[in-house]
Every structure is written in structure tokens, then in C-alpha cells.
Curated annotation (Swiss-Prot):
HAMAP family, alphabetized: Ala_tRNA_synth_B
GO molecular function, one term: tRNA binding
BP terms from Gene Ontology: alanyl-tRNA aminoacylation; negative regulation of DNA-templated transcription
Gene Ontology cellular-component annotations: cytosol
Superkingdom: Bacteria
Function: Catalyzes the attachment of alanine to tRNA(Ala) in a two-step reaction: alanine is first activated by ATP to form Ala-AMP and then transferred to the acceptor end of tRNA(Ala). Also edits incorrectly charged Ser-tRNA(Ala) and Gly-tRNA(Ala) via its editing domain.
The name this protein goes by in its record: Alanine--tRNA ligase
Catalytic activity: tRNA(Ala) + L-alanine + ATP = L-alanyl-tRNA(Ala) + AMP + diphosphate
Family: Belongs to the class-II aminoacyl-tRNA synthetase family.
Cofactor descriptive note: Binds 1 zinc ion per subunit.
Organism for this UniProt entry: Ralstonia nicotianae (strain ATCC BAA-1114 / GMI1000) (Ralstonia solanacearum)
Enzyme Commission number(s) from the entry: 6.1.1.7
Broadest EC class assigned to this enzyme: ligase
Length: 884
């Protein structure tokens, strides 16, 4: 059974069991700073399990793309060398949110495996938590699995409920026992059944884990022990590795032998011209193309930090393995079409992003191939020296400073260097590497404004109702919580800065790139200045600011009023951002995707995927398209609809954003996006749009800054004033300014040429005058002189003329400009055996606070102490006498 059939059969089976088939979420978790990447199928349902979100369904099934490469899930060194380690993998999963529980979950799992996938029943084993009699009885009495093939697993991780068969999301919160299903590959493969001392072998392989969240785990402050309280609505969370299941169904032992991987391994062999299809490097490359391609699909760009650096590490590891196979030019990006062929039907977004993926990989390959050969030469040389030293394998350690140099200068991620060292039985001195890294890392931290990251304030009250789309004033909002210095307080006093949570508010909390509102909260004697509005929790708004007068208490009623002028300017910029995004895609191409934005009252700053700087013509075209939309004065429409319906209607969803099942669709002009921000009523309200900056912020990421409305008027008035001042300075009309500037530039060029001619003439005359100052030392004419006003070029020209005239000579010339010393030394060819120009110039340079170098016949230097130059030059003759 092919991998594509395995996916579809899983989804179809659970659809017949009343499950809603849910699309895979991106590899970048939306609005979850605790996770680097989506690493399991349950990630997109985390808020449901925590009770902070609800879905219109109680049963779900999906095939989730996952990535484990970083943090505690960093198995990168094993990928390609074991049968089942991967960076990217697919997780088949089904979920129940307070609906069915253990019996249905296990019975359906058994039915799917034995009746649909046709796995031999006598090859399957199960494990349960040691006290989970319910699951044990379902396996043995309902399903009929022999008791000897159902293993109870206890607390095997050193603490109560710390077990392979007891799952918990965190130290406290939802948790419960789990039941794992194993497949027995047969006695010809070493290993023992689960729970036995030989369980780490490859004979018995876990294929499906069924987690039963039925308890709330909390710490008893009196006893210091954890307690388990039954949840009112138990849930089911299951996960089965698609690649492991495919290996079983296709009768192979290694995941790399399934049809999907065999196609990618063959493609890697083709591009690297490798005959041995069992080569581990081919497996590394085949694994990594999946991870890299889908990371790029989901909006990650290679960079030097965070997710971008993980992507860069994986790309460069693949390139290094290609280099190991003999590749000396870019090859990795050529595998994208093979991947699209294998996985494009299951993931249409991969096919749609094909050109962008190829472009990003090609660019990153070109960058690394510029340095990999030199870096590998240095690393191979160091490894050769370690081996030649004859040290015991356990004592072979690569200098951490060298590893850092490879990282800093040649772009070798540490784990790439460790990979190469591991192949040569050498370890890297990580402590020294870390020390070098820390020395380089900047210590200064910007004092940013107060921010409330989700979950940093201990709030347990009701959600905030937001009604700020159509009104900016609430006369009867009630205070539900107060926080000062991060702690909950019953009241706030004048002068204190803190956070106010209201039951309903017109204040927009920062989200989607739009800054939070400012304004005031007022009561009879209370005046609270709101400096910012942030989300305490996904649907709880915190008004951060300072209490000016009165005493504010929890339960008080206040009037909440948004700064209308600031909000209006912010709305103009936000609406213009949508129109600009649409125009950028039309002008530059459909590969343009939003990578970040900041919308405030002054400007909109928009980061997007694009590899080259925008041309002036492209900028003008984007401006023209946006302003045409503004002049059309089209009305803005916002409506709520299901996510799938929204996407089908043509609304653009942004990668990396987390959307619920019901979303707000904003139509403004020809733009249609999912957006929860505040916007103008009509496009004409924007007034005018102007791009004021375009730059690169990272590889493959461009940034545009733009302004709208009265900010454009102020910008144009300021520009007009500056043009007028420039015209007056050049004694021209503004309309003649370009022509006048060209004339001035021509005059400057002419004067520069005349200046060069005069300097050359001066050098010649000075050279004639200096010849007579030369002193004969053992047949060498020695001359040391200072040339006032001479630049480096004049010094060189004078030096050449003096060498011609003096024949056998050693000469030092110096000059001073802007407090800096410039030196040049020249020695004729027939004297270099006795005097070296480099030594001569350094003799002088060291006395004036500098150093230099060069060839035996010509050398240059600089210095920072011009007052010492005359004395230094005066000692040249004596120095030459000592040398000869």
C-alpha cells in the first residue's frame, strides 16, 4: 500500500466514524511561543484541551505534518543513520473532545489496523498504564488480545505518574494514561517486547499511541504531592507515525525503504551521481528535502536565529552530505520537483509554493557553496593533525575556538562540524565553542516598552467582549481585574502603573501587527491613562497605563474612551497595508507572502518574501495601484464565516497565523484577507498612500515602509521645502534642479581632474627637490621625508619618481591628513636583499602608533600619532646603517 493510500484510508475510516477531517496546521505553531515547531497532531488542538477554545465538532481526524529538529527533540545527528529517525514526519491522528473515550478509541484502532490495513492480529501487542484496568479489560475482553500480549507499564521514569504510559501536557493540568500499540517484526530481528530489558531493540516497534486525558493534575501545597482529579469531559488524543506504518504495510524494516523515501533517495542519487542507493548520505538528503521544503512552504526563511537558523542548519547539513558525495555545485534545490510529485497531491500548498521553495534553496546553496570548500579544508586539516598526534580516540577533541571560527567565518553550524568530527571519532570542545560565542554575543538589551505575553499575568476571570469595531466609547465598562508589577491587586492608587482588565471594551488589543489602542478610563474621581492595550490571554484584553487620580478598585464601573485621532490614523495605515499586499502580489508575483508587519499611527511597515530589491518602477506601480483603489472609494465589508468557506471565497490566510474555525473576512477594494483588525469604512478614507522606504531585512525578505493620509501631506510639504532650499542654493528653479545638479557634477569632475594634474605636478617638483636630500649608506641612497598635503596616490607617484632618479635606494615618505599618518616605503630591486620595505615602513609606523606591511620592494602603513612623525623619519638613516 502506497503512502498516499495510507493517508487517505486513515481519513476515510474516521470520517465514517463521525469525525471531521481537519487540515494539517503549518509547521510554525500559530500564536504559541512555547513551541519552535509543530511536533505532534494535537498541537493545533492544544487550546481545546486547555478549555480556552471550542470547535464546532467533538470528533476530529487529520494527517499532520510535523518537525522535530531543535530543543529537546533535536535528533539531527541520528537522521539518515537509523531506520526511523526523521526531521520531518507525518502524524495520523484522531481526537475526541469530551465525546467517545477508551472503548471506542481502542476498538476503532484495532478495526482500522486489522480490517482496513490488514495487519496480522498475531503481530500486534499493546501496553497500558499499570493501574488502567479499564484499558486492559478492553484489550483482553472486548478486543480479544491475549493477556500475554498486553503489558502493564509502571512508573519507569523515577517519579509518580512518570511513565511511558502516562501522558501529561505540563507539570500540572490535563493528563492521563495512554495505551500504545506495537508491531512485532519477528524473531529474526533483535529485541524484546515492551517493558522488557530488551525493549530498546528493533523487533517490537510502537506504531500508535492512544492518550486518554481523564485527570487534572495539581500540586497539593500542604503535602507537596500531586493529586489527580477526574476531568468533567475526558478527551482522546491519538497519534500514529505514517512512515512507520508504511514500512510495515510495504514489508520493509526501515522507513527509508518505503515508496515515498525510495523516490527521494533515487532523486538524490541522480543529482549527486551516486551509485550506492544504501549510502547514508542519500538518506540524510532525502529526509532533509522534506523538512526544508515544508518549512519554506510554511513561511520560514533561512536566517541566523530561531526557526530560520534551524532551517539553515538542515539545509547546510544536506549540502555537506552532498559535498561528501562529490558535489561541488548546487544540487539540493533540484529535488523539489521530485518531492512535489510524491507529496503535492496530499499537500497542495507544496505545489503552489514550488517556485518559491526552489528559489530560497538555490539562494542558500549558492551562499554556502562559496565557503564550504575552504571550511572543509580547514576542518579536514585539523582532524588530520589530531589523528597524526596519535592520541587515543577518547582523547581526540577539536578546539572549540576553531569550531567557532568555522561557524562565524564559514557558516558551519556547530552540529555540522560535530557531524564531520563524529565520522572521524573526534569530539568538539563545546565549552570553548560556547565561550567564544558568548564573547561575540551582544550583551546590551533594548529597554522595550511593557508587553504582556500571553499567560504572564495570573488571570482566571471571564473573557473581554470587544466592541471597538463600531464605537470608541463605553460608558459602563466594569473592572474585572487589576495588576501591579505583575501581581493581582484589589485596588490601584495614584501614580501606580499597571494593567486593568475590563468586562467589555472599545480598546483594540495589539494583534496581527496592529498596535494596541491608547486612551483613558474615567470615573467620578478616577483618571487612568491607557498607554497600550495587550492581550493577557487570547480573549482577555489588558489596558496598560498609569493611574493619575482617584483610587481604582476591582468591580468599579468606568468609562472607556479610545484616542480617536490615533485610532483613525492607525486604521488608515492598516487598510492601506491590505491594499499594498494585494498590489505587491500583482506587481512582483504570487510568491509574495507577508512575513511580518507593524501598523501604528505613523506608518505601516510590511515585511514580505521576495529575493531582490524593488525597482523604482515597481515601487511607483504599487503606489499607483493602491491610490487607484483609494480614489475608487469602495466600501469596506467585514463578515464572519467558517475558515474553509473563507478560503474557498478567495480570502487570503497568512502563514504562521492561528485561525479558529470561524474567522473574520475583510474585503476592502479588490483585497480580501482574514483579519481581526480595525479598518476604515471606505477606501477613500485613507486619503493618499506613499511608499517612503524599501530595504532588505534578511535573506529573501524585503521591507516596505509607507504612510497615508495627513502623514503623506506632511511628507510632501517637507519634501517640497527641501527641494526649494536645494534649488535656491544652486540658484535654479525647482523644475531645473536635475539639470543644474548635472552641471555641478560635471564641474566637480573637471575640478577633480585638474586637482589630480596639479598634485602630480607637485609630486614631480617635490621629487626633484628631495633627490638632493638623499644620504648614501653603503651604496644605498636613503631618503625619509614628509610631504605636506599629499594623499596616498601622490605618495605612490612621488615614490616611483624618486626610485627612478636615485637608482639604488631605500625611501620612506609620510604625510598627515585629518590627524592620521600615511606612510609608504620603497626599496629598489637591487637593494631588497639587504633592506626590506616592510621592515622599513614598520620601523617608522611603530613610532607613530601604527603598523603596516607589503612586498619587499613596496610597503604601506598608517599611524595615529602625527606629532611623532618628524622624529620617526629622522631615525631612518641610522636604522638602515644598522641593517647593512
Amino acid at each position: 500500500m502506497k503512502a498516499s493510500d495510507i493517508r487517505q484510508k486513515f481519513l476515510t475510516f474516521f470520517e465514517t466514524k463521525g469525525h471531521t477531517v481537519v487540515r494539517s496546521s503549518p509547521l510554525v505553531p500559530g500564536n504559541d511561543p512555547t513551541l519552535l515547531f509543530t511536533n505532534s497532531g494535537m498541537v493545533q488542538f492544544k487550546d481545546v484541551f486547555l478549555g480556552t477554545d471550542k470547535r464546532p465538532y467533538v470528533r476530529a481526524a487529520s494527517v499532520q505534518r510535523c518537525l522535530r529538529a531543535g530543543g529537546k527533540h533535536n535528533d539531527l545527528e541520528n537522521v539518515g543513520y537509523t531506520a526511523r529517525h526523521h526531521t520531518f514526519f507525518e502524524m495520523l491522528g484522531n481526537w475526541s473532545f469530551g465525546d467517545y473515550f477508551k472503548r471506542d478509541a481502542l476498538v476503532w484502532a484495532w478495526e482500522l489496523l486489522t480490517q482496513e490495513y490488514k495487519l496480522p492480529a498475531d503481530k500486534l501487542w499493546a501496553t497500558v498504564y499499570q493501574t488502567d484496568d479499564e484499558a486492559y479489560d478492553i484489550w483482553t475482553k472486548v478486543i480479544g488480545l491475549p493477556p500475554e500480549r498486553v503489558v502493564r507499564i509502571g512508573d519507569n521514569k523515577g517519579a509518580p505518574y512518570a511513565s511511558d504510559n502516562f501522558w501529561q501536557m505540563a507539570e500540572t493540568g490535563p493528563c492521563g494514561p495512554c495505551s500504545e500499540i506495537f508491531y512485532d517484526h519477528g524473531p529474526e530481528i533483535w529485541g524484546g517486547p515492551p517493558g522488557s530489558p530488551e525493549a530498546d531493540g528493533d523487533r517490537y516497534i510502537e506504531i500508535w499511541n492512544n492518550v486518554f486525558m481523564q485527570f487534572d493534575r495539581q500540586l497539593d501545597p500542604q503535602t507537596g504531592e500531586y493529586t489527580l482529579t477526574p476531568l468533567p469531559a475526558p478527551c482522546v488524543d491519538t497519534g500514529m507515525g505514517m512512515e512507520r506504518l508504511a514500512a510495515i504495510l510495504q514489508h520493509v524494516h526501515s522507513n527509508y525503504e518505503i515508496d515515498l523515501f525510495q523516490a527521494l533517495v533515487s532523486a538524490a542519487a541522480r543529482e549527486t551521481n551516486t551509485k550506492d542507493l544504501a549510502n547514508n548520505s542519500l538518506r540524510v538528503i532525502a529526509d532533509h528535502i522534506r523538512a526544508c521544503a515544508f518549512l519554506i512552504v510554511d513561511g520560514v526563511i533561512p536566517g541566523n536565529e530561531g526557526r530560520g537558523y534551524v532551517l539553515r542548519r538542515i539545509i547546510r547539513r544536506a549540502i555537506r552530505h552532498g559535498y561528501k558525495l562529490g558535489c561541488r555545485a548546487a544540487f539540493f534545490h533540484k529535488l523539489v520537483d521530485d518531492l512535489v510529485k510524491e507529496m503535492g497531491e496530499a499537500y497542495p500548498e507544496l505545489r503552489e509554493a514550488r517556485d518559491r521553495v526552489v528559489d530560497v534553496l538555490r539562494t542558500e546553496e549558492a551562499r554556502f557553496f562559496e565557503t564550504i570548500e575552504h571550511g572543509m579544508s580547514i576542518l579536514d586539516g585539523a582532524l588530520g593533525e589530531l589523528k597524526a598526534a596519535g592520541k587515543d580516540e577518547k582523547q581526540r577533541m577539536l578546539d572549540g575556538e576553531l569550531a567557532f571560527k568555522l561557524h562565524d567565518t564559514y557558516g558551519f553550524p556547530l552540529d555540522l562540524t560535530q557531524d564531520v568530527c563524529r565520522e572521524n571519532d573526534v569530539i568538539v570542545d563545546e565549552a570553548a565553542f560556547d565561550a567564544a560565542m558568548n564573547r561575540q554575543r551582544e550583551q546590551a538589551r533594548a529597554a522595550g516598552k511593557f508587553k504582556m505575553a500571553a499567560g504572564t499575568l495570573d488571570y482566571t476571570g471571564d473573557k473581554t467582549t470587544f466592541h471597538g469595531y463600531d464605537q470608541l466609547l463605553s460608558e459602563t465598562s466594569r473592572v474585572t481585574a487589576l495588576f501591579v508589577d505583575g501581581a493581582s491587586v484589589p485596588e490601584m492608587r495614584p501614580g501606580q502603573t499597571g494593567v486593568v482588565v475590563l468586562d467589555h471594551t472599545p480598546f483594540y488589543a495589539e494583534s496581527g501587527g496592529q498596535v494596541g489602542d491608547q486612551g483613558t478610563l474615567k470615573a467620578a474621581t478616577v483618571w487612568f491613562d491607557v498607554a497600550d492595550t495587550q492581550k493577557v490571554l487570547p480573549e482577555v484584553f489588558g489596558h496598560q497605563g498609569t493611574l493619575r487620580t482617584g483610587v481604582l478598585k476591582v468591580g468599579d464601573a468606568v468609562g472607556a474612551e479610545v484616542d480617536a485621532v490615533r485610532r483613525a490614523r492607525t486604521m488608515r495605515n492598516h487598510s492601506a497595508t491590505h491594499l499594498m499586499h494585494k498590489a505587491l502580489r500583482e506587481v512582483l508575483g504570487a510568491h509574495v507572502q507577508q512575513k511580518g508587519s507593524l501598523v501604528d499611527a505613523d506608518k505601516t511597515r510590511f515585511d514580505f518574501s521576495h529575493n531582490t530589491p524593488m525597482t523604482p518602477l515597481q515601487i511607483r506601480e504599487v503606489e499607483a495601484r493602491v491610490n487607484a483603489e483609494i480614489l475608487a472609494n469602495a466600501s469596506t465589508n467585514a463578515q464572519m464565516m467558517g475558515f474553509d468557506d473563507a478560503v474557498k471565497s478567495g480570502a487570503m490566510a497568512l502563514f504562521g497565523e492561528k485561525y479558529g474555525d470561524e474567522v473574520r473576512v475583510l474585503t476592502i477594494g479588490s483585497s480580501k484577507e482574514l483579519c481581526g483588525g480595525t479598518h476604515v469604512a471606505r477606501t477613500g478614507d485613507i486619503g493618499l498612500f506613499k511608499i517612503v522606504g524599501e530595504s532588505g531585512v534578511a535573506a529573501g525578505i524585503r521591507r516596505v515602509e509607507a504612510i497615508t493620509g495627513d502623514n503623506v501631506l506632511h511628507y510632501l510639504q517637507t519634501l517640497d521645502t527641501r527641494i526649494g532650499e536645494a534649488a535656491a542654493a544652486l540658484r535654479a528653479q525647482p523644475s531645473e534642479l536635475t539639470q543644474r545638479i548635472v552641471q555641478v557634477q560635471d564641474q566637480v569632475k573637471s575640478l577633480e581632474k585638474e586637482l589630480e594634474r596639479l598634485k602630480s605636478k607637485l609630486a614631480a617638483s617635490q621629487g626633484d627637490e628631495l633627490v638632493s636630500q638623499a644620504v648614501d649608506v653603503a651604496g644605498i641612497k636613503v631618503l625619509a621625508a614628509k610631504l605636506d598635503g599629499a594623499d596616498a596616490k601622490t605618495l605612490r607617484e612621488t615614490m616611483d619618481k624618486l626610485k627612478d632618479k636615485l637608482k639604488t635606494a631605500a625611501i620612506v615618505l609620510g604625510s598627515v591628513s585629518d590627524g592620521k599618518v600615511a606612510l609608504i616605503a620603497g626599496v629598489t630591486a637591487d637593494a631588497t636583499a639587504r633592506i626590506k620595505a616592510g621592515e622599513l615602513v614598520n620601523f617608522v609606523a611603530q613610532q607613530v602608533g601604527g603598523k603596516g606591511g607589503g612586498r619587499p620592494d613596496m610597503a604601506q602603513a598608517g599611524g595615529t600619532e602625527p606629532d611623532k612623525l618628524p622624529q620617526a623619519l629622522a631615525g631612518v638613516t641610522a636604522w638602515v646603517q644598522q641593517k647593512v
